[in-house]
Amino acid sequence: VPGFSGKHYNSLDPKGRLIIPAPFREILSSNHSSKLIITNEVFDRCLCAYPVDEWQKLTDKVSRMPQTSDAVKYFTRRVIGSAVECEIDRQGRVLVSAALRTDAGLNSDVVLIGLCNRIEIWDRSEYDGVADPTKVDKDAYKEEFKSLGL
């Protein structure tokens, strides 16, 4: 099953609707459904959009974890607790809730990043800051990539 990949620049309309890029919609219609679960990313100030089946895998995994763990509680509250099921309309748009737009600091200009099983949705200026290759510890990353076999 092909996954999501690529970077797409887009904008939110005044009502908070976002056009899902055509390549992402094609993957969804071929392999998943016309719905996305949109939620907060656990640490970064962005949103994650999951196909329903991928979301189910994630929630099944979390439900098997120790619910007394502070990390699991945080993850559950931050990610699962803020999730909204969104239908992709005939124009290829989803309505991003006001609460999620606020949590992620989304203004009108956004970037959608395909990350295999999910899509990240960033405010353009926020993404430009975190994606700056001059701001990462390349040597440490090279070592970690090597240990991971990348």
List each model region and its residues.
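C-terminal end-helix/capping segment
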Residues: 113-139
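A short beta-strand-loop micro-motif that forms or neighbors metal/cofactor-
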Residues: 30-45, 83, 105-122
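A positional/architectural concept
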Residues: 2-42
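Helix-adjacent hinge/juxtasegments
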Residues: 47-86
